[in-house]
Amino acid sequence: MSSDDRPVPAEPSPGPRSGSPGRHAHAGADQGGAIDWEVLAPFLERGAEIQTPLYEQAAAWLRALLSPDAAEGGAGGAPEAAAPGAASRAPTVRRILDVGSGPGVVSCLLARAFPDAEVCAVDATEALLVRARARADRLGLADRIHTHHAEVPHGLDSLGGADLIWSSKALHHVGDQRGAVAALAGHLRPGGLLAVCEGGLAPRFLPRDIGVGRPGLQARLDAAAEDWFAEMRAALPDATDTLEDWPAFLANAGLRTPRTRSFLLDLPAPLADDVRRYIQANLSRAVEEYGDQLDPGDLSTLTRLVDPHDPAGITRRPDAFLLSVQTVHTARAQEQ
């Protein structure tokens, strides 16, 4: 996994494990603590909702890639243009797997982006799948969205094939990431597309100098989160020390036409109150997760940032923003 997945405030990725700050919440699962899903699940769902503009960009790109008129192109991020109008035409996608779906926000988005497709939301946490089913029902998508309770990559054998497989911030929870990519690739139908959302950039939500404590707080949070993430990865069963090259993982799985693109979420100041509260919750979780790795000055600054009554707190200061980048790597199965 790359640096964007550090447990710092931003967008959670409700994958197979949940409990830590930032994009994740896997402290309970990875460290043996009990997880209160009544508290955590709405937090994960709201985080994914905040990221919806970014996911919509990614879904439009996937539609263009899957269009019969899509141009063959390189992997290096140059625009791979489809024929005029291709992105607006729904390609022939009949079945989608959302692996590590969490509460189903992206599952529902994919169902709307591909209106002829059945979507199977796959997650290891039944409480999150309950929310996914409820969300699909609220949006009138219950007839097209189904759920499957399974760990990744184990437990996927009964899933069957798919034209599109999406997995966001789930595979880095697997010790053998290369093997996990290969396992997912094995479920692609001929010509199907595997899209892995891993990487990007660490989010930003405050200026370098916030007028409290030592400037550069977020850079130091990044460093602490990197250490936390490395420890999490090292503790996974069957963890392998390998170069995290997602396009190479896709190629090693026998897939072709690798492409990579990054998508931006830019919520400028002043932030809406619910986004402020979401960042506040993430900061609180960061304190719990690796506050002991911070010096007393930074810990004091974080304490002020999460205080709803402090004028310097994240819920009250006018300069808070949210800037985030997610990277999606794709490749296709061979046509028969």
Tell me what each language-model feature is:
Residues 32-56:
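Class I SAM-dependent methyltransferase Rossmann-like catalytic core
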Residues 97, 103-155:
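Class I SAM-dependent methyltransferase SAM/SAH-binding core
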Residues 156-164:
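A short acidic, Gly/Pro-enriched loop at the edge of an enzyme's catalytic core
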Residues 163-177:
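A short SAM/SAH-binding and catalytic strip from SAM-dependent methyltransferases
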Residues 179-190:
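A short glycine-rich, Lys/Arg-flanked "PGG" loop and its adjoining helix->strand segment in the class I
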Residues 196-271:
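Conserved catalytic/acceptor-binding region of the Class I
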Residues 244, 256-336:
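Conserved Class I S-adenosyl-L-methionine
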